[in-house]
A protein has these predicted regions:
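N-terminal glycine-rich phosphate/adenylate-binding segment common to multiple enzyme folds
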Residues: 49-154, 237
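Extreme N-terminal starter segment of soluble prokaryotic enzymes
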Residues: 1-5
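Glycine-rich phosphate/diphosphate-binding loop of Rossmann-like nucleotide-binding domains
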Residues: 6-23, 27-29, 147-216, 228
């Protein structure tokens, strides 16, 4: 059966890295028989330019009907102070599709160890996943700003916590079987609920070790001993901070993918970096985050584990061969990097 994939190229370098990723997808599909069709839609700044809205109605309709969604990058300086901004489209898309679970793999490629701000012995063997609750908590609570007082409400239901904890256990079960739940239960009521739910869900996963860590301690460990972690799960605010902290371990945002999952609808796959408008159109953008996001899509949405493994191995082999774009210390163009990865599939 043909799989429908909606491609949201977005802004800046987005169209360039999207096309690079789709070239890799087409190549692996030709080799393995994966049948798919691409539906390109405007989104972000491109959506505003086309329709006046960052998430056009037709784009949302196509996304709802898709089997998976690829997003490259959004954001443009021309909208920095505008009433309608590209980023509003992403928030709306997450809400409309109920994308409650954000997944960020953090893996250090040995050939890029020198880029990390940490010493080689600190980052050796780092390979973990951050699972962040994406649709609840303080970001979606009431925000009250008065003249001399302000309040932000951090609100979680049992059901919201249970589904993200369960998702994290399922991921841990297929890895090293260690789940670290991060909270601030010595202070926050929401964290007390979080820890209680984690303990209850753990009974359904006796093969997975559950550990608890306070968020301040976890932030320290992510720098002093990041290889300790296998799967991390935490609430929206803590997850936002910790996932950004984890992204600096590799020394570059150009090689890190992510996914956002709903309970029943399509998932969204995207690089963690921005639209880099300063290099848009120059043909020098690093496509690896986009390509690895496509590998995540093949594995998570379509169960094509071997295809995903082949892409990831090809990326690793390309980097090991010293073929690098400018952001990671080389001179390869977007096209040259893409062709090198395809040659190693």
């Amino acid at each position: 059966m043909t799989k429908k994939i909606v491609a949201l190229a977005g802004d800046g370098i987005g169209p360039e890295i999207m096309e690079a990723g789709l070239e890799v997808l087409a190549s692996i599909a030709e080799k393995t028989g994966f049948d798919f069709e691409i539906d390109r839609r405007p989104f972000g700044g491109a959506g505003i330019d086309a329709t006046g809205h960052p998430l056009p109605d037709e784009t949302l309709k196509a996304a709802r009907e898709a089997d998976a969604i690829l997003l490259a990058a959004i954001g443009s300086p021309q909208y920095d102070n505008a009433a309608v901004r590209p980023e509003q489209g992403l928030l709306a898309l997450r809400k409309e599709l109920n994308l409650y679970a954000n997944i960020r793999p953090v893996k250090i490629f040995e050939s890029l160890n020198h880029l990390s701000p940490l010493k080689p012995d600190r980052i050796a063997g780092v390979d973990f996943v951050v699972v962040r609750e994406l649709t609840g908590g303080m970001y979606f609570g009431d925000h009250i700003l008065e003249d001399r007082k302000a309040r932000d409400i951090n609100d979680y239901s049992y059901e919201e916590v249970e589904r993200i904890i369960r998702k994290a256990f399922e991921i841990a079960r297929n890895r090293r079987k260690i789940l670290t739940s991060i909270d601030k239960q010595n202070v926050l009521a929401t964290s007390k609920l979080w820890r209680r739910v984690a303990e209850e869900v753990a009974k359904d996963f006796p093969d997975v070790i559950l550990e608890h860590q306070l968020v301040d301690s976890a932030a320290m460990l992510m720098i002093t001993n990041p290889a300790k972690f296998d799967v991390i799960v935490t609430e929206n605010l803590f997850g936002d901070i910790l996932s950004d902290e984890s992204s600096v371990l590799s020394g570059t945002l150009g090689v890190m993918p992510s996914a956002s999952h709903s309970e029943n609808g399509p998932s969204l796959y995207e690089p963690i970096h921005g639209s880099a408008p300063d290099i848009a159109g120059l043909g020098i953008a690093n496509p690896i985050s986009m390509i690895l996001s496509i590998a995540m899509m093949l594995r998570d949405s379509f169960g094509r584990y071997e295809d995903a493994d082949r892409i990831e191995c090809a990326v690793e082999a390309t980097l090991a061969a010293g073929i690098l774009t400018r952001d990671i210390g080389g001179q390869a163009s977007t096209k040259e990097m893409t062709e090198a990865i395809i040659a190693r599939l």
